Curated annotation (Swiss-Prot):
GO cellular component: cytosol
CDD domains associated with the record: trmE (cd04164), TrmE_N (cd14858)
Organism: Synechococcus elongatus (strain ATCC 33912 / PCC 7942 / FACHB-805) (Anacystis nidulans R2)
Pfam families per the UniProt record, alphabetical: MMR_HSR1 (PF01926), MnmE_helical (PF12631), TrmE_N (PF10396)
NCBIfam families assigned to the protein according to its UniProt record, in alphabetical order: mnmE_trmE_thdF (TIGR00450), small_GTP (TIGR00231)
The name this protein goes by in its record: tRNA modification GTPase MnmE
Listed GO biological process terms: tRNA methylation; tRNA wobble uridine modification
Major localization class: cytoplasm
Cofactor binding description: Binds 1 potassium ion per subunit.
Chain sites annotated for binding (6S)-5-formyl-5,6,7,8-tetrahydrofolate: R27, E89, R128, K462
Record function comment: Exhibits a very high intrinsic GTPase hydrolysis rate. Involved in the addition of a carboxymethylaminomethyl (cmnm) group at the wobble position (U34) of certain tRNAs, forming tRNA-cmnm(5)s(2)U34.
Length: 462
């Protein structure tokens, strides 16, 4: 896909919900975008065709003259467009038929169906965006919380790319100084080793400052997966319902009511959280319940955090111990539910387990009590605290973290080379590695295969 030949591409740019969408957009980009649009769009009246001016009219099949839709057209001529090419958007009525037929007319008129992410790839290749900005567009589209959206917007505005380019320029300056001494050793004064050591230390510290945001950024981007586990009838489903503030799971006094995983999507302290209410774990002869129990075990093993829930009035039982042993390799937070059934004195007297937990939280889910304490304990357990009040300029992805780590490691080797007073040729190897790694974040140095992989993760039409 990389290295496009200048052809014109087309794709549906909006999500299509059959019979429900109000507006659907078909987007064209390329040298022939306006010519193709003129073939299929009939302007109503005497409206002038001008860039960035919306036109009203009709989409028609140019061969048969058949009316396809009443629509709006928005031309955005190069370079003042998303891709820095001529871009035309056709705003149709939503639903499948109008946009699909409009897209087919565009292709018949000479456009090619765009590949996933190809519009953004063209924006990158044409210098409209750097690679970190391009990746942030996918993050913005998939953001599950206001904080994740804020981080994506910060990166889109260049708040990640700018410091990365500054770091790369500093490394390039050091490399230029070193190579000048290699090529013109007799004509230049010796390197100021103390100054270079200070520059390397400062650059490494700046890289570490960016890397220190990686864990929180990953939580913003991908979220947490939390499994609520426990024996039957301890209030797991009530806990999910109270937490979700709606009836997501059926609640009865009968053990084994929940037989399958029940999922809820929540935001906790700015972090997207997928909560799974699992079937009560116990020995059972019921084949359907056995399947649910096995799914509960698998859900717990794949969770980032397990909420082991017990009944306050029953205390810690042998069954609870067995369940703990099954999930003990995961981070566990103990939830003591139904606290309202005990007096204050009884709560203090209850025998708590000796195992180490991330935290112990008392709740009364049926009365919606203890949920705030639970959320605070979760944020403490993952080590983030509440992220809603923080200003997020970016959220590093795994590729960016790996590149920064590579650059940081390479600079440390340069420092070691300096301290060991090795020949200057040794410096250049590691400096070039750091420069290449930093350049891969913003796209100055990136393999075509990596570009294809990055943009293949985008949706078609973006």
């Amino acid at each position: 896909m990389v290295g496009f030949s200048g052809d014109t591409i087309a794709a549906i740019a909006t999500a299509i919900v059959p019979q429900q969408g109000s507006v659907g957009i078909v987007r064209l980009s390329g040298a022939a975008a306006t010519e193709i649009a003129r073939q299929i769009f009939q302007i109503a009246g005497q409206q002038p065709w001008e860039s960035h001016r919306i036109l009203y009219g009709y989409i028609r099949d140019p061969e048969s003259g058949r009316l396809v839709d009443e629509a709006l057209l928005l031309p955005m001529l190069a370079p003042r467009s998303y891709t820095r090419e001529d871009v035309v958007e056709l705003h149709c009525h939503g639903g499948l038929m109008p946009v699909q037929q409009t897209l087919q007319l565009c292709i018949r008129a000479g456009a090619r169906l765009a590949e996933p992410g190809e519009f953004t790839l063209r924006a990158f290749l044409n210098g409209r965006l750097d690679l970190s900005q391009a990746e942030s567009i996918a993050d913005l589209i998939s953001a599950q919380s206001p904080q994740a959206a804020q981080a994506a917007l910060g990166s889109l505005q260049g708040k990640l790319g700018h410091p990365i380019r500054q770091l790369r320029d500093r490394c390039l300056d050091i490399l230029a100084e070193v190579e000048a001494r290699i090529d013109f050793e007799d004509d230049l004064p010796p390197l100021d080793l103390e100054a270079i050591a200070a520059q390397l230390t400062a650059a490494g510290a700046d890289m570490q400052a960016i890397l220190s945001t990686a864990d929180r950024g990953e939580l913003l981007r991908t979220g947490l997966k939390i499994a609520i586990v426990g024996r039957p009838n301890v209030g797991k489903s009530s806990l999910l319902n109270a937490w979700s503030r709606c009836d997501r799971a059926i609640v009865t006094d009968l053990p084994g009511t929940t037989r399958d995983l029940v999922e809820s999507q929540l935001i906790v302290g700015g972090i997207p959280v997928q909560v799974l209410d699992t079937a009560g774990i116990r020995e059972t002869s019921d084949q359907v319940e056995q399947i649910g129990v096995e799914r509960s075990r698998r859900a717990a093993q794949s969770a980032d955090l397990v909420l082991l829930t017990i009944d306050a009035s029953a205390g810690w039982s042998a069954e609870d111990q067995t369940i703990w042993e099954a999930v003990s390799d995961r981070p566990i937070l103990l939830v003591i539910n139904k606290r309202d059934r005990l007096s204050e004195a009884e709560r203090h007297a209850i025998a708590l387990p000796q195992q180490e937990f991330k935290a112990i939280v008392w709740t009364a889910a049926a009365q919606q009590q203890g949920i705030e304490d639970l959320e605070a304990a979760i944020l403490a357990a993952v080590g983030t605290g509440d992220l809603t009040s923080a200003n997020w300029d970016w959220a590093l992805n795994q590729r960016q973290v790996a590149a920064l780590t590579t650059a940081q490691t390479a600079l440390r080797r340069v420092e070691e080379t300096l301290q060991a007073q090795l020949p200057l040729d040794f410096w250049t190897i590691d400096l070039r590695e750091a420069i290449a790694a930093l350049g891969s974040i913003t796209g100055e140095e990136i393999a075509e295969s990596m570009l294809d992989l990055i943009f293949s993760r985008f949706c078609i039409g973006k």
